[in-house]
Every structure is written in C-alpha cells, then in structure tokens.
Amino acid sequence: MAGAFIAAAVLATAITTPALAANNNQPDHIFFIMMENHGTNQIIGNTADAPFINQLANRYGVATNYHGVTHPSLPNYLAAISGDFQGIWDDCKAGPLVTCAPEEFVPGAGDASDPTFSAYTDPHSPQFGAVPPQLTPAQIASSSSTPHWFAGQTIVDQLEAKGLSWKAYMQSIPFAGADVEFYPTVGTTFYKLYAQKHNPFLYFSNIRGSASRMANIVPLPQLEYDLATGNAPNFVWISPDQCSDMHGVGNGNPLGYPTCSYPASGLDHGAIQLGDAFLRQTVTKIMNSSVWSENSIIVIAWDEDDYGGYPTGCCGSPTGSKGSQSAVLGGALAPAIVVRRGVPAHRQSSHPYNHYSVLGTIQHLWNLPCLANTCSLSTADLMLDLFGNGSDN
C-alpha cells in the first residue's frame, strides 16, 4: 500500500546523533508526523476507522483543544517549522517568483472558511446564520503578492546551531531533495501522492540553497534504514503521502487505492482507515527500534480541520475581519497526540494549543531560541503537560 515502507536497500549517509546530557529534560529524538484535514471529533473516539490512533490516545497524551494555525495546509506546515505562517493562505508551489491569491477566508473557498458555505446558509444546519471571519482587502493584497520563497529561520537553523541532527522523510517523493510539485505523473496526469505543499522545507531559501540540507529531505524508506542502523537523527519530520495522511486524492483507482478517493458525500472513512494503517506501521517501527530505548517522543498532529469545523484558532493564529470586528482566522479543532517513552499514564489536556505550541515546546526541551510566534508563548503555554518534564523517564 502507499503507506508501506519499501524494504530498505537504501544507501545512506550516516548521521551522528549527539549524546545529550543525562537526567535533564532534553529528549534524544523527537518524531513529528503531520496528518491531514480532519477534526478532533472525526478521529478521537472513531474506533471503527482509527483503532490504532485511539489506542495511542487512550494510553498516552491527547490534546482536546488543539487547533490548526489557519487554512489551508501550506501555512500550517510553514508555521510548524518556522513559527510563522508567512502571511499566505494558499497551497501553491515554492519559488522566488511564485505568488498566489488566497484560497481561504474568501467567497468561493468551498469549505468552512467560506462565508457562502452551505453549513451557514442551510436553515437545517446547526451553523445556520454563522458568519466566518474573512480576510481584509489589505490581507488579500499582501498575500497575493508574497513570493513563496522565505528568508527567515526555521528549526533547521536552530538544530544545526545546537549540534543536533535532523531529517525530513517524505513519502512518495521520487528522490532526496526533489524539486517537484507533485509525484508521480503518468503522461501529463499528476496523481499527487507526494505534494510539495506538505514539504515546508522547500519553501525556505537557506534550505534550498544548501546541498547538505537538501540531502536531508529524503524518501520515507530511508527512515527504516536509519532506524535499523541506529542513525535516526535527533529531529525527525515525517510527511505521509496523500493516501496515507488522510488527505485523499480525487481518484485513487489508477493508483490501486480506491478508498483514497474523495467520497461523494459524508465522512471519508477509507482515507481515515489508510491513515490509521500508516500510523500503526510507522509508529510501531519507531517503537520497536533502538531509539525507543532512549528518551524519545512521537508527536502526531493534524494540520487543520479543513472541511467541517468553524475556523476557531488560538495561540498566535492570524486575525481578519468579521463585520466591523476583528476575528481569528484559525484552522479549527484538529487532533494531536503525544507519545513519550517512560510516561505511562494517559494524559489529556484541554489547554488551547496549535502548531506554534509544538514548536515552542520542542525549542524549550532542547534549549533552542524562539522563532516568531513562539516568542509570545509563556512556559504555561507549552505542551509540557503532554510532553512530560523529563523526570518521568
């Protein structure tokens, strides 16, 4: 299946994982797996479609008030590694000359960020009459003219400055550092298993301009090799492809995954089941590897609730207008689960969190500087209630 690891006869450049001091809060490895486009109530409690995810949620840490930073996908991914959504509301490809008009918080978006969305106009809908926030004219103009080639720092800069290793593992990317928007293609048709919008590293000029950094953006099968050989880096980013991250594609039949196709209506049970199977396989491989004998953490988060949830937000989400008032342009409630070795008790937090909260917590645990919106987080705003404080290990 698309979510499977290929048996790894993969040539790898060994990464030396720095030894971290014992008896402190610093984890040896943090794995961040980003899933797609579902609300908390579609996943947590849905044991029929997502049994493995719910096993994790019932055993480890779960955030019940976690939000996407905004809509759509790309700005959430940018926020997760840079502390800033970079002022865009689109999913366009990377490039110094690439600019795009906003796809969200404008009429025609076609989802819960759209003021003409059926949920707000249908008298039988519980959200009938609700008005979502919208972009201001100034925000539309600024976003439409912003090149998708960002010069700011990311967690990559911070990790390297600290002597910590990192890799980004991308399922279905054709080769390390590939500059393609979608993959694979057959003739002129894109099948979009790999989508560049889920690879935020390619949008930053100081990563694109570095051969060594581009070499760290690798196909997912490399992870199995790195785990088996003890070469897993300190920070591991994992982007499943669109048939494994619960996003889905327009037509999964040519790929051999009909349940990956968008449903005509209702909940996309097939996409959730594929994502649950991917996480079962991937998380199990991590937990069965030697890295799990060390002080390690797995974070599983969904980028946003793209279709069903009113666009609530928190913790530095941008604001737009709602009539004469300002209002949050959030990414709605989405699931987030934290698995930490040595923290056995189930933990549940209703504290408001988002992707900035995850990044800020990682920075805190590794004594890294803050970035952009993570600089506004107090210690009380960090996810230490779910990540644990190190004394439990």
Residue ranges and their predicted role:
Residues 2-14:
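Bacterial N-terminal signal peptides
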Residues 13-21:
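Intrinsically disordered, low-complexity Ser/Thr/Pro-rich tracts
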Residues 20-393:
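N-terminal pro-sequences and low-complexity stem/linker regions of secreted or lumenal proteins
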